[in-house]
């Protein structure tokens, strides 16, 4: 559970006077009274409930467990797989010689076997193939599932029922399979919290983030996906990752009641950041040391911990900045330090939004930030409510700090006032209103399902400009897609892309520029046709047949696989357009 999700849920509950459930899947959460702990800590509103899959299952009666609908025919012999029980713990595990999980048995609070989760169904002792079996008190099989995804979906069906509901997913891990949870009565929303690329410094068409690859390829399967900033939304829209289902809803921040007129030591800087490579704290230390070397009084207090602490400690000593920079480690409620600080630094390589920037501004503390993707440039007006510096430019960062230190008191007070005013755009009320606008715009209309749709290649040709594709589509039913795309995915790595296709009766055409596939320098790609409806999404693997005509080049070989599907093999290095 992220702090952002807790704060948003509490804001929904408080401002809209509604009950909100936070759903968790981890077995480690079973038996932990996190709801009570969080409420006592003031982290959640009294109308917010923390609900855990395993806490539910281990306390439910057989009558309620039977509401969990399986997706495969029950095999009674599954009971023979039970592990010997070695104690009174609710879990028994079986692992291979390398410590990889092969089986987990879970027990009901009443003491009887509840679940057997085997993950070596293809060959015992080797991971591969899964079967999750749910048992009743009489130890007879209630239901079975071949995947954790189907198992989780069955639980969600019981939890949500038939009433209209809004399901907001904050987890990339869950997002990678929850996009398949489509129910007419559930509006499904995905929140993209961080950079969509595997390498934030890569070109826009580079590999997608591995931990998000499952859901980034299926954004149109959600009713709506939110980004935290307009700039990230624009970047994702330029790649056609979504057909108009992306929208911006920022994180909310607390009103810290920063006083622009409050006297503060001008030289006092603060920074809240993990001490990790992503946060690039070494640049902040170097900049402070440079400013101090020019006989300007300046200090920096850094709050946070992480793997880089030993390196940063050595750097502080080598820069003779022990009296200038202090590493405080993790401190609860560190954002309150901004109320007495004059300026803050952000030197990250990338951000989802940069919540710490909003916290600084809310406190009237002037942010001096690298203009990285994504966040600072969406929030800060340079020279008005803060300062923006080219990413990685330590000298530029030093210059910005020096500029701030040299401003008149009147200029600084005005800047603090502007910072607080800008932060107010992200306080709880306006962001909850924005969520209300986004969710109320969604529909509970029946979801269009076209599992039988078929797309077949007519011609596919590698030209000087790219790949020219013609195909025919059939069996899509009565509903017409509002948009169609040809998509491709690399078999290795996390490369994915799509371009919009055009339709003339049953003929579909698309042009894929070489530049879109340029980052894939070697290997195989598979092509599909994406059908996007107002509410509904289907990805159809494009088939080849005996009449399909393929024209390849020495760099890209187009062909039909042994299973009769349209694929390509990139033989050489990056393809470039000659147009």
Please place each PLM-identified region on the residue numbering.
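Donor nucleotide-sugar binding/catalytic pocket of nucleotide-sugar-dependent glycosyltransferases
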Residues: 187-191, 196-197, 204-257
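Conserved donor-binding/catalytic core segment of Leloir-type glycosyltransferases
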Residues: 260-279, 285-288
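A short, well-ordered alpha-helix in the C-terminal region of glycosyltransferases
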Residues: 321, 337, 410-425, 437
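Aromatic "clamp/platform" in nucleotide-sugar-dependent glycosyltransferases that forms part
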Residues: 330, 349
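C-terminal alpha-helical cap of glycosyltransferases
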Residues: 403, 428-452
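Basic, ligand-binding patches in group-transfer machinery
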Residues: 445-579
